[in-house]
């Protein structure tokens, strides 16, 4: 009996053949040369019926292929949300799947996992809120579920630094409403205003008390980092001073 046919049946969603092969004694966790199981392929296709059949037959929802991917991770990457409830009920690595969903902008999957009680930790020193700081919908969702808006990544950046760097005014406003320190400095001594290069972001940060002339570890102000002419103009109009940094270099003011 060639149990590799179980893999082919899962790839094609052939439920009758799957059932027969399982009844004949094939392991539901047979692997191909890539370390992938029938459940992996069913999850990748988003085949709810086949996923349910394999899990009931004892398939391991936590089996990883040679790239380290589990069925729930590949389902999330493939945006097959329908199978996530089945997989998340018995799978470990759901937090990893949550990061994958957020990274791919899969709002529905993120909402589902948060609603089931999955709470993100930090991945490589980066919180989930740092990761999605350019996506207002996900920022709002994570804040609603109590994710820390003041978390710092490995470089000392907060989500507000990241939202400013993304020039996402909606994200910046959502975070500012949570009351973070608008002048918090990262490991380079930069405040969120140092990263903002969008007029709307700059206006929001200043409205909440950002220091126009804060200096970083190199003695540079936000004006030194302004690459957009309108952003530079907004800073100057509100009182930014073109002072030299610690190397004696003045800001280069871009034109509009």
Curated annotation (Swiss-Prot):
Recorded hits in Pfam families, A to Z, give: Ank, Ank_2
What is the protein's species of origin?
Pyrobaculum aerophilum (strain ATCC 51768 / DSM 7523 / JCM 9630 / CIP 104966 / NBRC 100827 / IM2)
Name the domain of life: Archaea
- Which segment of the chain is annotated as a signal peptide? none
Q: Where are the ANK repeats?
A: 1-30, 34-63, 67-92, 93-122, 124-151, 155-184, 188-214, 218-245
Q: Which UniProt keywords apply?
A: ANK repeat, Repeat
Q: Which PROSITE patterns match?
A: ANK_REP_REGION, ANK_REPEAT
Q: What is this protein called?
A: Putative ankyrin repeat protein PAE1861
> Keyword Repeat, does the record have it?
yes
Say yes or no: keyword Cell inner membrane present.
Answer: no
